[in-house]
Amino acid sequence: MSGKNLIIQGIEEAQLKSELPEFSAGDTVTVQVKVKEGTRERLQAFQGVVIARRNRGLNSAFTVRKISHGVGVERVFQLHSPLIDSIEVNRRGDVSRAKLYYLRDRSGKSARIKEKIR
């Protein structure tokens, strides 16, 4: 049992991305996603607030929420996915929770997040 676990662990460590920025819930990020349309491949930017982060090694994921034309859009990204080209932190948010699911119910000024001064 333990031997198989070590083999899987070794394979997963080889798949991990190393050049990822530090970010957490409340931060505003821009994620450049590789999108394939027919034979062409292009980058699509998705900018929004990180409302959740799930740290599970290779299975780590984060959820980004933005308001597009008055409609809330959430997208879950796998942190180490080959489809993610880059992640850029635009703004650090000062929040006191790890999961910001309460932002789903809020709109306008009540959905704003204070900026963290470092």
Curated annotation (Swiss-Prot):
It comes from the Bacteria. Pfam families: Ribosomal_L19. GO terms for biological process: translation. Gene3D superfamilies: 2.30.30.790. SUPFAM superfamilies: Translation proteins SH3-like domain. Keywords: Ribonucleoprotein, Ribosomal protein. GO terms for molecular function: structural constituent of ribosome. GO terms for cellular component: cytosolic large ribosomal subunit. InterPro entries: Ribosomal_bL19 (IPR001857), Ribosomal_bL19_CS (IPR018257), Ribosomal_bL19_sf (IPR038657), Translation_prot_SH3-like_sf (IPR008991). Disulfide bonds: none annotated. This protein is located at the 30S-50S ribosomal subunit interface and may play a role in the structure and function of the aminoacyl-tRNA binding site. HAMAP family: Ribosomal_bL19. NCBIfam families: rplS_bact (TIGR01024). Belongs to the bacterial ribosomal protein bL19 family. This is Large ribosomal subunit protein bL19. It comes from Alcanivorax borkumensis (strain ATCC 700651 / DSM 11573 / NCIMB 13689 / SK2). The gene is rplS.
